[in-house]
């Protein structure tokens, strides 16, 4: 699942992403951000790892990536205003798309998933 969003005035493709709310676990945040940006409820099933991403403005982000299964579309919700659309695309469709990626990490995460590098959610702890 990919979201189409506007970044610096350009429509780009990205995975649902966001931030942690106070007292929220990474897994809870991943499910919440997916719901807010796509209106899809999801079960987070595995962890793909962490990537350090430095944005063009110099800010450094730690990006945690997860595997999820979309379980239910919530048609009572309105997705975040920053999201143009939600797309279901294979890797090949993504590469053939004329829409740019928000960052190279988008394709890297897909490649990690295809390579089978996902690990148990037990690795992600919230104390």
What is the role of each PLM region?
Residues 1-15, 42-46:
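N-terminal strand-loop-strand
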Residues 20-43, 52-104, 126-127:
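Unchanged
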Residues 107-127:
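Charged phosphate-binding loop/patch that engages nucleotide di/tri-phosphates or the phosphate backbone
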Residues 1-4, 74-78, 121:
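Short, well-ordered strand-loop elements centered on a beta-strand within folded domains, enriched
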Residues 1-5, 22, 115:
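Short N-terminal signal/transit or membrane-insertion segments
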Residues 48-50:
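A short glycine-rich, hydrophobically flanked beta-strand micro-motif that places a catalytic Asp/Glu
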């Amino acid at each position: 699942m990919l979201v189409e969003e506007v970044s610096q005035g350009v429509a780009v493709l990205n995975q649902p992403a966001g931030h942690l709310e106070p007292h929220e676990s990474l897994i809870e945040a991943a499910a919440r951000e997916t719901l807010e940006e796509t209106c899809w409820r999801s079960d987070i099933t595995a962890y793909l790892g962490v990537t350090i991403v430095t944005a063009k403005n110099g800010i450094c982000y730690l990006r945690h990536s997860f595997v999820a299964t979309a379980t239910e579309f919530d048609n009572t919700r309105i997705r975040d205003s920053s999201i143009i659309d939600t797309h279901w695309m294979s890797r090949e469709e993504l590469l053939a798309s004329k829409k740019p990626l928000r960052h190279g990490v988008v394709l890297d995460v897909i490649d990690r998933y295809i390579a089978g590098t996902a690990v148990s959610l037990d690795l992600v702890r919230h104390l």
